Amino acid sequence: AGGREKAEAEAKRQAEIEERARARAKRDAREIWTAAKPGPDPILVDYLAARGLRFDPWPKSIRFDPAAPYKVKRAAHRGGNWETLHAGPAMVAAVQGPDGKFSGVHRTWIDPARPGQKMRLAHPDSGDDLKSKLTRGSIKGGAIRLTDPPGASVMVMGEGIETTATAWISG
């Protein structure tokens, strides 16, 4: 019985750790969203225009952070801590759960020196390329709703914001 009780206690402890991590991720996502500026920003408008996208009206689900921090976990010999590698412009999109409520964020770091391009970053320890798009919060089963017109009879879905927006804007 002692082994089973220990295993159950460990499973409960792990579940509590995971629940705290999920709650922290949701809080982080809300803070990121709240800190981002609503409405179009010239850097974001230029990025999207270089990709052939012009929103009218501007989606409420898209915001801009001029100095979004990009954090990486450093190698153990460097302390193993999270460190800000880059702070720069990012498109911030709200992710909504199936219930329509905010559940997370999707960020795309933009390279203003290269129109229409995402920021290129490499991990300082390994040199590996890093993703220019990151999410935070509860993303599974969620969607970034660019528009929600009343009485719509067609739904456009896609893998990425820019890809989906291209299909939506083209009609």
Where are these regions (language model features)?
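TOPRIM metal-binding catalytic domain and adjacent DNA-binding surface shared by DnaG-type primases
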Residues: 2-91, 96-99, 149
